[in-house]
Amino acid sequence: MKISEIGKLLDAQLLAGEEHLDSEVISACCSDMMSDVLAYVKDQGVLITGLINSQVIRTANMMDMICIVFVRGKKPTEEMVELAKECGIAVMCSEKRAFEACGILYAAGLSHKGGH
C-alpha cells in the first residue's frame, strides 16, 4: 500500500515527507509505548501512535519505519516534524482513534507481518 493511500484512508493531513507518498509499505504497528515498539516490532513500515514526543521519531528511525501516523487529533511539535524530515520519515495526523485507524488499514490490506 502506498503512503498516499494510507493518508486518504485515514483522512490524514501530511506534515512531512511528500517525497515518500509513492513509497510502498506492507505492514504497520500501533503503540503508545515506544519500548514495546523496540522490543516486539519487526519489519514494520508505518507506526500509528497518539504519543507526542521526540522519542516517537527516534524510535521510528531506529526501526527503519518510513511513516508515522499520529491519531486522536494529536499534532507533533515543529521540532518533531523537523526531526522527522531529517530522518526521512513521512508524518501524518488523523482525527481517527487508533483502533479505528488500524481497522481501516487492516481491512484495506495492510498487515502486522513480522510483529506480535
What are these regions (language model features)?
Residues 2-4, 97:
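Short, structural beta-strand-to-alpha-helix junction motif
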Residues 19-20, 26:
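Histidine/lysine/aspartate-rich catalytic loop segments that bind and position anionic ligands
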